[in-house]
């Protein structure tokens, strides 16, 4: 699905407000989200 592409857009897919959109882009990597 194009969900991964949607995450690249700022505040497009991330369910929670994250200052690091880059980390949110890789939602599959929970480690990256934790770093944010």
Curated annotation (Swiss-Prot):
Posttranslational modification: Processed by the macrocyclase-peptidase enzyme POPB to yield a toxic cyclic nonapeptide. POPB first removes 10 residues from the N-terminus. Conformational trapping of the remaining peptide forces the enzyme to release this intermediate rather than proceed to macrocyclization. The enzyme rebinds the remaining peptide in a different conformation and catalyzes macrocyclization of the N-terminal 9 residues.
Gene Ontology MF annotations: toxin activity
Cross-link (Cyclopeptide (Gly-Pro)): 11-19
Propeptide feature ranges: 1-10, 20-36
Keywords from the named record: Toxin
Record-stated family: Belongs to the MSDIN fungal toxin family.
Role played: Probable toxin that belongs to the MSDIN-like toxin family responsible for a large number of food poisoning cases and deaths.
Name of the protein in its database record: MSDIN-like toxin proprotein 10
Provenance organism: Amanita bisporigera (Destroying angel)
Lineage: Eukaryota, Fungi, Dikarya, Basidiomycota, Agaricomycotina
Gene name in the database record: MSD10
């Amino acid at each position: 699905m194009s969900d991964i592409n949607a995450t690249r857009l700022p505040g497009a897919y991330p369910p929670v407000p994250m200052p690091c959109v880059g980390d949110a882009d890789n939602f599959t990597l929970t480690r990256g989200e934790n770093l944010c």
